Regions:
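N-terminal leader/targeting and accessory segments in enzymes
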Residues: 1-89, 93, 447
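C-terminal helical cap/extension that packs against the catalytic core
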Residues: 38-42, 351-408, 444-449
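Flexible active-site lid/hinge loop adjacent to a nucleotide/diphosphate
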Residues: 147-232, 242-244, 256-263, 418-426
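Nucleotide phosphate-binding/pyrophosphate-handling subdomain across enzymes
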Residues: 9-19, 128, 258-362
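Short internal beta-strands
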Residues: 22-29, 209-213, 340-341, 361-370
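Beta-strand->loop->alpha-helix junctions that form or flank phosphate-binding loops
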Residues: 27, 51-52, 88-92, 226-243, ...
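ATP-dependent carboxylate-amine ligase catalytic core
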Residues: 48-60, 91-96, 120-194, 201, ...
Length: 449
């Protein structure tokens, strides 16, 4: 039975029907059954499960496939395990149905950027592959194209997806970084680190683990990894990819110069180094790697330059849904900055964020969303008093514009999820961009201070 009729759940059910499995569909929202895609699954033979108690549902199936949005401690998942039945996720199902070698990239931040770089390098190098996973393309939607050993699978993997892996074994695992995130679901940092490490659990000596040598949380479990370790570092020479005197090397082979890389920020340099490791393991040549690194400018809503309007630079970093990601953006923008923070909280504390803000180029912080009061207390507790609360998102943007001077940057980097006001970070980013495009000046000036 597939539990959760999101994009991943629908793809999982579709793949199971292709395998002639008997498929039941379950979702706690009856509205989920009203979509055309679910109708199509039902026409193909899937059975909707409606208006039944959990005790009535349990006997229907042998394996429960959880969509990523359903936590493993959900009552139905717990009851399923107690009866001795298997609980797996969509990623695990995809692994069981495919023959392709898998490159699996996880980490708190930078996953989408890194898999996108790998994707573009492999495309340039003419290496057959498919991109899927947490990038919005379910793994199981690619099964038909991943039916042979000569087509690689490049997958972004989240901590939610790693909750439900058991046999999953990628040819290359890549862990970019581990900093506090999703603690409202994973409860403790120890558990979150453990979940990230699970991506390596089934790997053997014949497989590869690409690891950040500068991340203490990754180093805490790296000795237990059986796969061949390939390291990356922006700070020191390692057996893998590293930066030295403005040049990027893979072992002793010079790949390109740092100044040629189109992406900005130290965090993106780390993503680039990780992608180089994966690409070199897969046989990509240096010319293909350099071509992509010199042209690829990044993903939408990740320190995205929106425009220079009325003397101000506007940046959309809506994808910064945790404090570490916001800190990366703050470190990247060097000019005087008005920072817009806030959204739905994820169980983080903000002391480290405001300590970083105190020593940065941030002049003022505009707080918005559900996290506003918590963030304001954290700011004051750290001795940063230039905070301006405004619950309404659009009024917060207007306030940031008002507080700005010619030559300033206005940066949306929320450090929180978007679910208090928006469907996702992308919708929040687009709302910011529209508000910026409508801006016609009106910041404070010498006369109205």
């Amino acid at each position: 039975m597939v539990f959760g009729l999101s994009k991943s759940g629908i793809a999982a059910a579709d793949a199971l029907l292709d395998e002639n499995a008997k498929v039941f569909l379950y979702d706690e929202s009856e509205n989920a059954f009203s979509s055309a895609k679910v109708d199509e699954l039902i026409k193909r033979g899937a059975k909707p499960v409606l208006n039944r108690t959990l005790s009535e549902i349990l006997p229907l199936y042998d394996v429960l496939v959880l969509s990523p949005g359903i936590p493993v401690n959900h009552e139905l998942a717990v009851l399923t395990k107690k009866t001795g039945k298997r609980v797996i996720g969509e990623i695990e199902l995809g692994y069981l149905l495919t023959k392709s070698p898998i490159v699996a990239v996880t980490g708190t931040n930078g996953k989408t950027t890194t898999v996108s770089i790998i994707d573009k390098i492999l495309e340039t190098a003419e290496i057959k592959h498919e991109l899927c996973g947490n990038v919005g393309i379910p793994f199981t939607s690619k099964i038909k194209r991943l039916s042979s050993y000569d087509v690689l699978c490049v997958a972004e993997i989240s901590s939610f997806q790693l909750e439900t892996v058991n046999l999953f074994c990628p040819h290359i695992s890549c862990i970019l970084n581990i900093t506090p995130d999703h603690l409202e679901r994973h409860y403790t940092m120890q558990n979150y680190v453990y979940l990230k490490s699970r991506i390596t659990f089934n790997q053997r000596e014949s497989e590869f683990a690409v690891l950040n040598a500068d991340d203490k949380n990754i180093l805490s479990f790296s000795d237990k990894i059986r796969a061949k370790k390939i390291w990356f570092s922006s700070e020191k020479r390692v057996d893998g990819a590293y930066l030295k005197n403005g040049k990027i090397y893979y072992f002793d082979d010079m790949i390109t110069e740092e100044r040629k890389i189109a992406l900005i920020g130290k965090h993106n340099l780390e993503n680039v180094l990780a992608a180089i490791c994966c690409a070199k393991i897969l046989g990509a040549d240096n010319s293909a790697i350099e071509e992509v690194l010199c042209s690829y400018k990044g993903e939408r809503h990740r320190i995205e330059f929106v425009g220079h309007i009325s003397g101000r630079d506007f940046y959309d970093d809506s994808k910064a849904t945790n404090t570490y990601s916001a800190i990366s953006a703050i470190r990247t923008i060097k000019k005087p900055t008005i920072l817009i923070l806030g959204g739905k909280e994820k169980g983080e504390e903000y002391g480290e964020l405001f300590e970083e803000i105190k020593k940065s180029s941030v002049k003022y912080v505009v707080l918005t969303g559900d996290s506003m009061e918590h963030m304001q207390k954290s700011a004051i507790g750290c001795g940063f008093y230039d905070v301006y609360p405004e619950k309404d998102f659009y009024k917060a943007i207007a306030l940031a514009e008002y507080l700005s001077d010619d030559g300033d940057a206005i940066l949306l980097s929320p450090a929180c999820s978007s679910f208090d006001c928006f469907k996702n970070y992308s919708e929040r980013g687009e709302a910011f961009i529209k508000a910026v495009k409508d801006y016609n000046g009106g910041g404070k000036n010498e006369e109205n201070r």
